[in-house]
Amino acid sequence: IPRFTNKEDLLKNKEIELVLIADIPVKRAALAIECMNAGKDVMLDKPGCTTLEQLKEIENTAKKTGKIFSIDFSERFEVPSVQAAYDLIQAGEIGDVVQTIGMGPHRLNIHTRPDWFFDYDQYGGILCDIASHQIDQFLFFTGSKNVEIINSSTGNFSNPDHNKFEDFGEILIHGDKGRGYIRVDWYTPDALPNWGDGRLTILGTKGYIELRKYVDLVGREGTDHLFLVNNKKYEYKNASKE
């Protein structure tokens, strides 16, 4: 695999069709636009941008160049329990999806973080940074195309030394095919054996599914714990083994 010491050589290389971007969030949009103008498709780590102005520029560039702009929402693409839940919903196990409740707690590990991590202008705020995962899953599971943010709030309740940092956020969403609530934070306690107890509850007209994606507080080992309840079943699945 060839290595490049500068961006210009990479963009000039005709053999490269796709560029992956994981720079500081505020810089990702400009890099994506530059790559698309150079004839490359792009995939970005989330968040793909930090402002609406950046998003509009990205959309205009993608339309002008015909190149693909995509974001790697790893919680949907790479977490087995999320795919397992989708398969159960497609099989009719909980009827029509009415609501998602997405929880995204994270461990801060404050002494390992670079300065930009605490600067709102650099990372886009907690709803942009973390809750983009939960918004993506809301859209995915409800199928909503037209969405309104009914209410959102953020706060800094535990990190007074970083006044441009948000350590808590929540969103209430209404879509044309469902409702959603999201809560994200940087409060994972040290005793938890991993970085966060991420959960997703999907409510349907005939049942519901709860995902405990990364840890089960009851004590089951591993990840991707799925609970299904409907009119005929009340069961647990280890989705990591499916």
Regions found by a protein language model. Name each.
Residues 38-40, 65-68, 178-179:
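A short helix->loop->beta-strand "cap" motif at the edges of active sites that frequently abuts
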Residues 72-76, 91-112, 126-134, 146-158, ...:
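NAD(P)-dependent dehydrogenases' Rossmann-like dinucleotide-binding region
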Residues 136-218:
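Contiguous beta-strand/loop segments that form the cofactor/metal-binding neighborhood of enzyme cores
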Residues 26, 49-110:
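A contiguous active-site-proximal alpha/beta segment in oxidoreductase catalytic domains
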Residues 39, 114-122, 230-234:
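Short glycine/proline- and charge-enriched loop/turn segments
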Residues 5, 44, 69-71, 211:
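Hydrophobic residues in well-ordered beta-strands that form the structural core
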Residues 2-61:
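Beta-loop-alpha module in the N-terminal Rossmann-like domain of NAD(P)-dependent dehydrogenases
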Residues 222-242:
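C-terminal helical cap and adjacent loop that interface with cofactors, partners, or active-site loops
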